[in-house]
């Protein structure tokens, strides 16, 4: 794929055109069709206006956050770069437009990019243990066997852990430095979160002969309606705020404010975000960065609701603190900070305390079981 323009679609609706500038930033303009009956695909950065939008932030290497959300993260990017290298293409020479063209219509969320750079064929999921071994081979810089197969199944995925995707499910494999029961741990965390009143997607353990099972989560950016798969437009907090998720630059105050604004002050949505904050603190999920919170657009109501919770597991960070601070405290937040965030968001103080105490109690066995986990 060579060219300096790319068209953006949502289903068969023409959203707009992206074009690369001389300094390798990617400008965007809505189509006339979208200006007549569309919505702001990024609520703060890209209002529905007849103008050319040029990103000023370098958080996403010249892209607006909404489009950067379509790109794969660490694991998917590794697969893309390995696949390009196998074809004699230097990854450093690739533009952001070309990387989006590789994503085509296979990315997370609802946006699709045309013309797509079709460089792989459809692949069927085979033996999961064999796929896991191939993933580990790639991480260890070894011969991985059928690279095209792995790319097709995981080249558009987010997150750092090896994974494969189908139209309805994401299946995760342990990374090389993880214990083999990482799947059972994440399943336990998601089950506990549901018990804590947090909305989570359907999950299950896929059978394995070499570990206790591979964690599988049902995709919430896809919805089956009358046998048809509907793609749902969603954005991460990083994309909405145009911030680099790899830096700890966010507080739960911000997430609560975002939820109030995006959901049009929906009290249930606000309580969901509060519950997730309490769970992350009490269950020691410190990898709570800005790409681990997403909102899904409701076109009928013209508002955004928090997506089901995801990536809930025992985790730490290299700096030993939460990626998202709690009332300014990232190292050891507790009840005081949680209640302060709830109060600032306008929640009932008594209700906040009841929720926090309930989640603390429900996470005791879970947190103790996995204390000291090396992630």
Predicted regions mapped to residue ranges:
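Phosphate/dinucleotide-binding and metal-coordinating scaffold of catalytic cores
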Residues: 1-290, 294-375
């Amino acid at each position: 794929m060579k060219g300096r323009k790319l068209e953006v679609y949502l289903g068969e609706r023409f959203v707009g055109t992206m074009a690369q500038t001389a300094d390798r930033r990617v400008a965007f303009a809505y189509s006339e069709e979208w200006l007549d009956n569309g919505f702001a695909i990024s609520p703060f950065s890209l209002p529905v206006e007849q103008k050319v939008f040029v990103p000023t932030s370098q958080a996403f290497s010249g892209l607006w956050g909404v489009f950067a959300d379509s790109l794969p993260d660490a694991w998917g990017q590794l697969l893309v770069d390995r696949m390009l290298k196998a074809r004699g293409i230097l990854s450093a020479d690739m533009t952001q437009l070309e990387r989006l063209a590789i994503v085509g219509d296979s990315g997370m969320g609802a946006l699709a990019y045309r013309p797509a750079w079709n460089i792989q064929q459809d692949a069927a999921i085979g033996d999961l243990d064999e796929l896991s071994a191939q993933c580990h081979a790639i991480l260890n810089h070894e011969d991985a066997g059928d690279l095209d197969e792995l790319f097709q199944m995981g080249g558009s995925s987010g997150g750092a852990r090896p994974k494969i995707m189908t139209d309805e499910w994401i299946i995760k494999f342990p990374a090389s430095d993880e214990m083999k029961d990482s799947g059972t741990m994440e399943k336990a965390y998601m089950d506990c979160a549901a018990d804590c009143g947090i909305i989570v997607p359907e999950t299950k353990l896929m059978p394995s002969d070499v570990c206790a099972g591979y964690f599988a989560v049902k995709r919430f950016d896809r919805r089956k309606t009358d046998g048809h798969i509907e793609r749902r437009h969603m954005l991460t907090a990083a994309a909405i705020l145009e911030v680099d998720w790899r830096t700890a630059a966010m507080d739960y105050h911000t997430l609560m404010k975002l939820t109030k604004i995006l959901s049009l002050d929906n009290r249930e949505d606000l309580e969901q975000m509060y519950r997730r904050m309490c769970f992350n603190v009490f269950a020691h999920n410190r990898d709570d960065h800005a790409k681990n919170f997403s909102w899904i657009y409701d076109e009928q109501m013209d508002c955004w609701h928090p997506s089901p919770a995801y990536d809930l597991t025992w985790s730490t960070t290299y700096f030993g603190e939460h990626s998202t601070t709690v009332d300014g405290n990232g190292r050891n937040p507790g009840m005081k900070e949680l209640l302060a965030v709830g109060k600032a968001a306008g929640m009932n103080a008594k209700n906040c305390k009841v929720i926090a105490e309930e989640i603390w109690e429900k996470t005791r066995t879970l947190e103790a079981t996995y204390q000291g986990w090396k992630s």
